């Protein structure tokens, strides 16, 4: 399985439910498994001051809040839940340089804390690792070549040493493609190629106005084209979950009517 996030967890659960008892190899650049949801008392801190901080200050504050919560037997997950409603504002109030630092150094660690899985599924992943039925590899896939009934994977590990695996099948669990220029959807390629649209901040998704209207290559807003969901990640960051999608869909419907 290529990728170690939520899609990987779903894939492993599906394989186990279908009776697969062989070894599962999971490969990703950071080899980080999603962390579990937790039950317990909610954290009672005010996250609003985070909005005035830079990236380094925010990360330090969150670690301190999580540590303080732990002294009262409050799970760190509740701290993350407190900042959940501020997701888009937290992204938009970072400087461009801090956003770039986040994408380069923080995002993988953020994702496993922010996008979590059910505790029983997390326990299942740990048990599979413990019994060596799930092996986690930190590396970057380079080639995948079919050889008879098998697929031979060639990768580069964290120390840039070659890593080879021979498997029966490969599952792409890398999730949503965020890089605009790497998107293979013909419509999106045409929008970008013709200048009707342009890549969003940091080359992620499509550039949009605050109301979701598409922005073209010249910076002109096109209100007749409304953008929703993962294509707005560059502008909003939090743009995948149901609450955000519901709000964007309502705004698009209002614009259309």
Predicted regions and their residues:
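Flavin (primarily FAD) cofactor-binding/catalytic cores of flavoenzymes
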Residues: 1-56, 60-257
